[in-house]
Amino acid sequence: MSTTGRHHPLYVAQTRVFVSSSRYGTKDISAITIEVNMYENIGLPYITGRLIIIDSANASNAVHFQGQERVTIIVLDSEANPIMNKEFICVGIDFSQKVGDDKSGFSVKLIEEHVLLSNSTRFSKVYEGKPDAICNQICSEQLGVSVTPEGSPTQSDMRVVFPFTTSPLEAANWMAARCTNANGIPFYFYSTMDDNNLQLKDISNLLGQGAFNADDPYIFGTTSNKGAGQEEDWDILSKKITNYTINNNEDTLLAMARNVFGGYYNFIDTYEYGGEEIKYQLTDPLETLPKPNGSTTYNYDPAFTTGRPYHEGQNTYTSQVVTRKLFDDKFSFLEEDTVDKHLNKSKSRAIYAFMDQQPINVTVPGISFGFDKLGQQMDVYIQKDIPPEEKSNIESVRDKKRSGTYLVQKVMYTIFNNRLTATVTATKTSTDPSLGAEQLNQN
């Protein structure tokens, strides 16, 4: 990629891309890489990437991508300081096209190395300990990457036997999914751009943190104060939302299918208490989550009824046969000593699905956003549509439903011509208590 000398909130100074392989030395392909994309997802323990290359320098022969090369991406700020340095493994070329008599374009897929190691590894081993410790031990031993925990799972020490058909990341995901706090709230297991360790974090802790841009939100609306012939103020540019979309969300039928609101469970203990039926209700774990801005609940109305509230219904009937005392001295993977502790599995799955009920996508300047915001909360201000003749101020035009605090769940970083943008998928975690007093505009 080219070098820019602009000290601008939207641009990086340089983006350097290097490729290395045991077949040849390190090669700098920055000049022919026209676009870099990197993808974070709070639900995945790995990061993926993509390079768009316009080849007019014989790169396809000189570099000869085969899906095994090591790719290093370095982003430098205006002072030539590295603000991001990430290493990937090339996993192939997903398309190639001739774009002229003397050049062609192709897209190179990238992924973190520990994913390739996991996919090429099958192991069988017995582990003992709490599920978060076992998750870390698997990743450290099998993949060479550590897991940084935040929060303390309530599950007891257990003994887990993994069969030889299991890959390391599959086993680690099992253990991460087994982690809940005492209220049944699950943990996210994911990878971030700014830390080589994997993360395992209690959702309650993530929701309890303040927004990294508190009182200085990203803004979608009329934000410019520039005069004629002037450039837009850089402070405004650094927090301006350039694109805002809402995907399919708040899907009640899908939530029901996922047992988000309620469910009927039968845990059959083969050791002592036999079968015991118990109802799961969404209101129970919701009551334990942090609620900012004076909210009384998250985006669910427990009083709504067309016969009965959703959480009092049962969308499915689930039976699980659970042993106890499979081992004399420790629990096995699925064992608990009470039905209430078994119910944490149901609460965990429901809250995990509930977190996807109200996402939005916003595109913001990548320089101000940085590479360390996955799993953090951000403040967003969305301007609502108003009639042009209506008098307004910054508070009256605020969209109270869409403005507020969001948890960053996915980020796509795009670098094109050294312009860095971050497209963020985030879920609303705060509700304005005055929202219910809003009136329809009948004019």
Task: Enumerate the predicted regions with their spans.
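Active-site-proximal structural scaffolding
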Residues: 131, 164-168, 182, 191-193, ...
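Surface-exposed cap/loop segments at beta↔alpha junctions
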Residues: 59-150, 159-161, 176, 202-204, ...
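Short, cationic low-complexity segments
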Residues: 77, 131-137, 141, 221-237, ...
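Short amphipathic beta-strand/extended segments with alternating polar/hydrophobic composition
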Residues: 23-35, 83-91, 121, 210-224
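Short beta-strand-centered interaction patches in the first periplasmic/extracellular domains
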Residues: 105, 112-114, 151-257, 268, ...
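Charged, gly/pro-rich, cysteine-poor intrinsically disordered low-complexity regions
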Residues: 225-374
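A broad structural signal for short, well-ordered beta-strand segments within beta-sheet-rich domains
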Residues: 12, 26-37, 90-92, 157-159, ...
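Juxtamembrane "anchor/assembly" segments of surface/extracellular structural proteins
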Residues: 1-74, 106-117, 150, 306-443
